[in-house]
Structure formats: C-alpha cells, structure tokens
Amino acid sequence: IYMDWHWVETVPPQFGSGWTGYSWNTDLFPDPEAFLAELHRRGLRTTLNVHPADGVRAFEDSYRAVAEALGRTAADGLPIAFDCTDREFMDAYFDVLHRRLEDQGVDFWWVDWQQGQHSRIPGVDPLWVLNHFHFLDSGRDSKRPMTFSRYAGPGSHRYPVGFSGDSVMSWESLDFQPEFTSRASNIGYGWWSHDIGGHMWGVRDDELATRWVQYGV
C-alpha cells in the first residue's frame, strides 16, 4: 500500500511534509487491523510504503513510545531525527515504530527513498543500511527474510526485492524497461517490481497501459 495508508495532506505545517508517516490515515482505513485480517483471509500479504527521512514527529501515534525508548521527553514535541548510524535510534525504529504496525498485521516493508546518499559516517548510504537491517529484522523468529526496497545501486540485490523507482508514463519508458530488467540479471538482480503503467508525467494512453500490463505479466 503506497503513501495513502498514512496521513499526508493533513500533517500540520510546523512538521513539514507528509512524505514520512507511521500513523494510519483513519479516514481511509478506519479499522486497520480488520482490513489487514481480511487481506490475510484472502491469502494476501501486505507491505506498507515508508519514507523514513523525517524521523518520528510529535503527531505520530508512536511518538511518545519512541521518545521514551530513547530516554527523551515527549512533552517538548521535538522531532526525533532519522539516523541510520545511531544504534539506539535503529533499535527504537524497529522494536517500537515498526513492531506496533507488524503486530496489527503488516507483513513486510516497502522502503522508499528520501534519505539522500549520505549519513554521519562517510561512505555509508542510508538506503543500504535500511535494506540490511530490514532484511535481518524480517528474518527474526526463524522466518524467511523479506524486504522490498527502492533500487540502491549495483549490489543492493543482496537483500530486497527491487523497486525500480518512479517511471514516466511514455512509450519510451516502456521500451526501456525490458532491456533494463534483462541486463540487471547480468549482475544477479533477479527480483524486480516496476511501476506498471508508469507513475508520473507523460500521457494517459489506454494502449500504452495495456502493453505495459502485458509486459508485466
């Protein structure tokens, strides 16, 4: 489920954009647990899209619990910054922030990108760190590890099913994808998810959409 699962347009302006979110949009999902249980009943598994870059802000359902886990005061309402190089933050990121949603029925995570390519440690890319730890965390309790992530460059297929990122709605974009996908197999990248039909810009074209679905199948 893409960003619609969490609050986007209604995030108070003092907190910035709605890209990052960890609280269900109850206007669209009034009973998340029942919704996820019904998907499971139908034999489906659910992944939620996350853009972790803005950390945990005071409007989030888990803000107080994350603040307490980090020994901070929730009353000040200060944002808890995303920091993939901070062990304590990453522990709270998984054990509090994500575990609450997994306990409701979320099966795995769709890690998206807003974090940039740099962290406090030179040469450490946040998306690589997220891929590594999401993969390991998903394998706890002897489960088969599973994570779904935006492409982080050659070699990143060590961990996730790859999401190739935003694609333009055009014939040129569709023409590129088969070659791109086939060439990826040359370096062992065998699991891909593309935006079938395109994601942005371009034009609406029913023939294009049909051919894109045909390619995806």
Residue map of PLM features:
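Catalytic-domain carbohydrate-binding cleft regions of carbohydrate-active enzymes
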Residues: 1-217
